[in-house]
Amino acid sequence: MNYKKSGAEPADHAIGRSRGGLTTKSHLVCDGKGRVLAFLVTGGQVADTSMLATTLEQISVAGARGRPRTRPDRLIADKGYPSKANRAWLRRHGIAATIPERADQIAHRRRRPGRPIDFGEDQRQRYRGPNVVERCFNRLKQWRGIAMRSDKYARNYHAGLCLAATLHWLTTTL
């Protein structure tokens, strides 16, 4: 394959304005051991919640036999993801979710009749586990080029993330 035709470069080079200035956001999905399963690179102004379905659609994990797995059994996410659209998408695809609700959503649901608010003890125990995704990000950002986004093009930054994630897979005990 020709290096000039290797992939479409986004028009904004995955650099967008956010509170801290021009920045890039990496959206990733990892397994329980903190190994990257899929990731996307977008501009800094893109909300995490809008990229959940797109990021989950990138998962492809090869097994011993058959076609690769493309869906997790369960998704554990933080308070940035509890939108109705995300929960509906997860239900449609048969993915169980553990996503705590934000305080403003809980207060809104208390004012309205309907399903009671219950995060449940089993959900709390499941969510209480170590923050694996944050540690995965920290492990990837030990590479200075990824932490500082020293690449001009998004595809080069994406390739650096891919290399760091691969090395992380190789050094993590299975």
Name each model feature, range by range.
Residues 139-140, 156-167:
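Charged alpha-helix within mobile-element recombinases
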